[in-house]
Each structure stands twice: as C-alpha cells, then as structure tokens.
Amino acid sequence: MMSSMQREAARYDLIRDFYLDVVGMEVGREPTAAALLDLLGDVRGMRVLDVACGHGRIARELARRGARVAGVDISEVLLDRARATEIGDPLGITYLNVDATSSRALAGETFDGVACNHGLADIDDLDGAVATVARVLRPDGRFVFSILHPCFPGWDEDAPSSWPRGEGYYAEGWWLARNPGIRGKVGSNHRTLSTYLNTLVRHHLTIDEVAEPAPTPRMRARQLAAQPDAGPPPVFFVVRCRRV
C-alpha cells in the first residue's frame, strides 16, 4: 500500500509533461502568483522556503528578487526539471525531496519567509504541513499561501473549484474534478475556510493580510456567461500570516 507521500507524488509524476505545458514558467500567467509575491514583499537577502515548489516557477522568481531560496516537493520528477533549469541558469536555489508534513522535515532549518502557491490543496495532511511551516519560520516571519477560494464552487464543471458542484461546502476531503484540467487529473483536497483558519491559529500563525485576486479576463468572461444575473464570486484566496 502506498503512503500518503507516495500517492501525492505519483499524482504529479504521472502528468509531468501536461503539468509543465499548462503551468509553464511565467508567473504572470496566473493571478495568484502575483498576489502571493506582493504579500511576501521585499525578499532581498531573506531566506525563503517554497513549499510544494514543483518545477521551480515561484522559487526562481523569488531568487530573481534577491531571496536565498530552498524549494521542497515530494515529486522527484518535477524536482528533476527544477534542478535541470537551475543547472542551465543558476540562481543559487537548493531543491530537496522532502515530505513537508513530517515532524522531521527540515530539522534545524530556519527561514524568514515561506511561500506555498496552490500546494496546500495537494497535501493530504494540512495540519502536518502547517506545523512544519510554523516550526521552521523565525519569529515574525511571513507565511504566504494561495488556494482556490474555499467558499465558492466553480461556475460550471470546467471551472476552477475548491469543491465539487452538488456536494456542498461542508463535504471536506479529496475529490477529482470532472474536467480536463490539472484538478481533473490529480484531484484536490477541499477544506472549509474555518479549517484553514483554525489550523493557522492552532500553530500560532496570525493573519495580517488577505487578498482575493481578480480572475483573468478570460475567466471573468466565462463567469459572466454562466452567471449573467449574479455577481461572479471570487475564485482565488491568498493569505499572509506571521509567526507569533
């Protein structure tokens, strides 16, 4: 029987080429990436950890902005791509195959900031991941993460959605979207907003700013076409908190 870590890694190992084609390397292609980087603020000289770093898109942007970056992921396949990019265009990034939910993860390490762009939805053990973040973050250090907005379903079956249409907001757990996108291939963990917030509180992380980035113009047009009589709800949710 596969462990939780092996299951999570296999989801992305099996779709590497598809994932790389869809996501690419440009941070400007995704609304949440810009918001996440803005909330992290000036990272020059900071030591920053990128959790669920994948092929290194956010890690490389952080390094370009002057951070000393370590990226962790459980998919060795995606890390191989990140390392290959680093060899071809060195930015001083260290990539590690680490289970961020383990109580032994990154033992003895300390970071000024931690970023996680959409990765929490892929991690089955939310509490374990946040516990690790709180443990490695220095006092007053920043943790910024982005997720699909947990409060609203997608406007149709093909839309990004934190939870399956028809199942209900309170039905937490892993689910597989019925569309050809990434979440239709690797699935996603849905949690209520209170689950996210209470997990932060439990690990002494205090929220000091949130953002709900506007969707891309293409997404907005699709929202309006599907829901012409209602104001389209937000799609994304980005949170910054600090260790106290």
Tell me the role of every PLM-derived stretch.
Residues 147, 151, 181-195:
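Acceptor-substrate binding/catalytic loop of class I
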Residues 127-142:
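A short glycine-rich, Lys/Arg-flanked "PGG" loop and its adjoining helix->strand segment in the class I
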Residues 113-126:
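A short SAM/SAH-binding and catalytic strip from SAM-dependent methyltransferases
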Residues 2-44, 57, 61, 78-81, 142-176, ...:
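Conserved class I S-adenosyl-L-methionine
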Residues 105-114:
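A short acidic, Gly/Pro-enriched loop at the edge of an enzyme's catalytic core
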Residues 49-51, 55-103:
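Class I SAM-dependent methyltransferase SAM/SAH-binding core
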Residues 187-210:
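Short alpha-helix
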